[in-house]
Amino acid sequence: MSGSSGTPYLGSKISLISKAQIRYEGILYTIDTDNSTVALAKVRSFGTEDRPTDRPAPPREEIYEYIIFRGSDIKDITVCEPPKAQHTLPQDPAIVQSSLGSASASPFQPHVPYSPFRGMAPYGPLAASSLLSQQYAASLGLGAGFPSIPVGKSPMVEQAVQTGSADNLNAKKLLPGKGTTGTQLNGRQAQPSSKTASDVVQPAAVQAQGQVNDENRRPQRRRSGNRRTRNRSRGQNRPTNVKENTIKFEGDFDFESANAQFNREELDKEFKKKLNFKDDKAEKGEEKDLAVVTQSAEAPAEEDLLGPNCYYDKSKSFFDNISSELKTSSRRTTWAEERKLNTETFGVSGRFLRGRSSRGGFRGGRGNGTTRRNPTSHRAGTGRV
C-alpha cells in the first residue's frame, strides 16, 4: 500500500485492485486483522481498465453501500485522498464514548446517527449494536491515534460484493479493550465502565437470539394446547376400528348384456296379444272356470308381464296385482338380509362419529353448560312418579 506511515487511513479514499484486475474506489471504514478483511464504504467499480485479464469487466455506475474484501486476492491498495481534518476532542485514553451534534463537519455524519454497516451480523467483529453507530464520526476524528498500516502485513483479498441499504447496516467499534471513566459531549458524566466492545455486542446478540427462540416456541405451545383441549372433552370418543363386511366387485357391470334381457318389442307384442285375448272373452261372455281362477291366483308372475295397465283391475278385485315379497315368500327377511339389500341398493353408508358436531357431544365436556332435555326419560320403568 502506498502512502506515508503517518497518514490516518480510516476515512481515506482508497483505490483497491483485486487479482481479477478489477479496480474499486471507496472510503476505508474498517480493517479486521483477525479475519484479514477490509471494508470499504461508498464503493464504485471501475472494471479492469485495459489491464490484462482473461475475463474483462466493464465499469459500473452503481455506488455500493459497502464491500468487504478478503486479503489474499487483493493485488494493490492506494490511498487517493486522506481524510479531512476534523475538530474533535484531544486524544485522551479516558474517553470511552462521545457523540457529535447535528452540526458536525464530518461528511459521513448526517443529522441522524448513521452507519453504513448496520446489517453485517454474519461478519462477527463488524457487527455491533445500534448504540455503536455513533462511533463512525468519532473514529474519523481519532484516526490519528490508530497505528499506521504497514505494507504487506495485512494481505487482503476480494471476498464478495455485498450491497445493502444504509438503514440495514451496522458499524464496527474501533475502541481499545480497556475502558475507564469518560464523559460525553452532551454534558452528562458517564459512569465508570470496564466493558469492551465485545461485552456490549454480546448481550444484544444473545437477546436477539432469545427472542427468535421464543417466537419459534410459541406455535408449538399453541399446537400442544389445542391437543390438550381436544383430549379433555369426555364426549369425544375415539372411533374404534370396526371391521365391516365390504362388498367386493369383480369386473365392471355389463350394461349391454343386461339390456339384452329386456327386449321391449317382444314384451309389447305379448302384452297386445293378451289384451286382445281378454277383449274377445269379454265380448263372447264366456265365464271363467274355477280352475282358471286358481291358475291365475297361483301364477301372479304371468300377470306381471302384462304391464302397468293390468296391475289393477276394478271389475276383478279391489286389490292390485303388484308383486310383493309377502306373496312370493312365506318367510320374513332377516335383519342381515335387509341390510345387505339396502347396501346393494343404496351403497355403503358412511360412519357416524359421535361428538364431532358439538363440543362434548350429548354428554358435554367439562364446564360447557349443556343439560339434558328430558331427564325424566331415563326413569321409565322404575315405578317412580
UniProtKB/Swiss-Prot annotation:
Record PTM Phosphoserine, positions in chain: 106, 115, 154, 165, 329, 349
Compartments reported by the entry: Cytoplasm, Cytoplasmic ribonucleoprotein granule
Motif (TFG box): 330-350
Modified residues (Omega-N-methylarginine): 351
Principal location class: cytoplasm
Keyword Membrane: no
Residue numbers bearing the N-acetylserine modification: 2
Disordered: annotated span: 164-246, 357-385
One GO molecular-function entry: RNA binding
Subunit structure, interactors included: Component of a ribonucleoprotein (RNP) complex. Interacts with DDX6.
Family listed: Belongs to the LSM14 family.
Entry protein name: Protein LSM14 homolog B
Source species of the chain: Homo sapiens (Human)
Lineage: Eukaryota, Metazoa, Chordata, Craniata, Vertebrata
Gene name of the encoded protein: LSM14B
